[in-house]
């Protein structure tokens, strides 16, 4: 097997893995959608800051599931987020998410880790594509 054939095989293999990961992540989010909706409703009832992307993400289906959970992941990890040019997200928003019981936040953190693995595999796929393009024009 030549190096070019090996790279093509890896490219196809990674593409199949990416499709499987995408389907699995979409199913995993859909399975927990009621938990997400309840968490979002509870969060909004508190009058806490919510970014525009999270507000409109439900219109785009599973294509933006990562964006739906990212807001809560960043708050859970305590990342300083600018809400407007003048101010950061309220400290109460961080406290709310960080004080959630494990059963409400663990699935979001797990899905976030799965998306990070997904993005790492996608990076490998693009790297493989780049090598094929550069060396085998």
Residue ranges and their predicted role:
Residues 38-100:
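Membrane-proximal soluble regions of multi-pass membrane proteins
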Residues 14-19, 120-128:
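Hydrophobic cores of alpha-helical transmembrane segments in multi-pass integral membrane proteins
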Residues 27-28, 39, 137:
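Conserved binding-pocket/active-site segment within a compact domain
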């Amino acid at each position: 097997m030549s190096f070019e054939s090996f790279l093509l095989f890896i490219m196809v293999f990674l593409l199949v893995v990416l499709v499987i990961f995408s389907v699995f992540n979409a199913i995993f989010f859909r399975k927990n959608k009621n938990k997400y909706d309840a968490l979002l409703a509870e969060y909004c009832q508190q009058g806490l800051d919510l970014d525009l992307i999270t507000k409109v993400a439900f219109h785009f289906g599973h294509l933006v599931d990562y964006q739906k959970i990212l807001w809560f992941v960043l708050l859970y990890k305590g990342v300083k987020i600018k809400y407007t040019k003048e101010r950061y997200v309220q400290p109460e928003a961080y406290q709310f998410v960080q004080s959630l019981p494990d059963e409400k936040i663990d699935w979001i953190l797990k899905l976030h880790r799965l998306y990070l693995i997904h993005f790492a595999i996608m990076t490998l796929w693009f790297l493989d594509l780049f090598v094929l393009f550069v060396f085998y024009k």
